[in-house]
Amino acid sequence: ATCYTASNAIKITDTSATTWNGTTWSNGAPDLSKLAIINGNYDTTSHGDFECCSLLVNLGFTLNIQADDFVLIQNDLTNNGTLNVLNNGSLVQVNDLGVNTGNISYQRIASVKLQDYVYWSSPVSGFDVNSISPLTPGYYHWQWNPTILNPNGGEGNWVNASTTMLGGKGYIVRAPNGFSNTANQ
């Protein structure tokens, strides 16, 4: 079978589905030809990575993608439950036109020294820049503005960021106050 999506006029339903019930998949492991439905808690450490045509996480259930694990979705993601991507875990949505609905929580941990800056980019919108590192003073949160003049007479400079992150836009945040300049913490 092939992974199909709906057109404007006709929906071709050739995609089989498999449902996770907390213990096993109803129709074999998901693959790029199947809709994967999470109807029981799923953790990639215990149950493994998977690929699917589209993914549905039902209300009341949690999908945890752990460090060094992945879930690859060819098309659409509908999250009505809880979806957590932990540090160094990966959620990959292949189709640029794929629809992504629901909230996703990403955890990222950076090992930094006091004067280090970490570059962040928001794959999803709606996260407060100040929440990246609550112990870092707000005047060390920056975003790039390509339209203002810089001290060298060119265009583009860093400006203070005290806003909600926008998808695909980059930010830099300094390490929290109290961190050492000599040792990673």
Question: Model segments located where?
Answer:
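N-terminal exported-region signature
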Residues: 7, 16-185
